[in-house]
Amino acid sequence: MHPTWALGFGDEVWWSRLAQPDQHCWTDTGATTTWHELVPPKGDLDPTALACYGRLVRPQPQAPEQLWLRFVAGRPVSAVTIAFLAWCSTRLAAQGFTALLLIWDNASWHRSQAVQHWIRQHNQQVKRGAVGVRLVVCPLPSKSPWLNPIEPKWVHGKRAVSEPDRLLRADELEARVCAYYDCEREAHLVMPKKVA
């Protein structure tokens, strides 16, 4: 791979405050453990789940991979995807990269006309000297999430941050996720009101 290109695997994930992930644990012979879906108390204004964009960046084969996260105030949509791509592009350019080989699934917001148009415009602007990296999209085959190496990271992360005995607040869950992946907490990406 070219030394100024980065390989990036993208995905979105929901972090539930209520549902418990599949867990494996040791128990005494004959004993069982049961995980229950938690119930929020009346008046709880926190969302039941937090949407999050993730990018697993592999700069070079010998360099350590990086996992970047951005939580979303709302849900993944084209406009939020564009904001996330712009953030990733600026961040990679600051590290000296010139291109991102972006591998992701076929989510509707990845394939949308708005995202495709933005990527074309962005690449043209970068070619003319704007700050950022060129984005080369490499879609995964349909129904093939196991080909994306970020997927197992979500599974392990959900197990690691889960709390069996109490309901986590949304900000507490976000803090645990960022701590687990050793990521800085960034401002939430905001879903435009017109698509809400």
Predicted features by range, described:
Residues 1-87:
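Extended, low-complexity cationic-aromatic segments
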Residues 3-5, 134, 142-143, 147-196:
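C-terminal anion-handling pockets and recognition modules
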Residues 4-5, 48, 98, 132-136:
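Short glycine-/polar-rich loops that comprise or flank the Walker A/P-loop
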Residues 11, 97-111, 140, 148:
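Acidic/histidine-rich, metal-coordinating catalytic segments
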Residues 18-21, 111-116, 150:
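A short acidic (Asp/Glu
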Residues 32-43, 122-152, 165-166:
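RNase H-like polynucleotidyl transferase catalytic core
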Residues 80-101:
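Short, basic/hydrophobic alpha-helical segments
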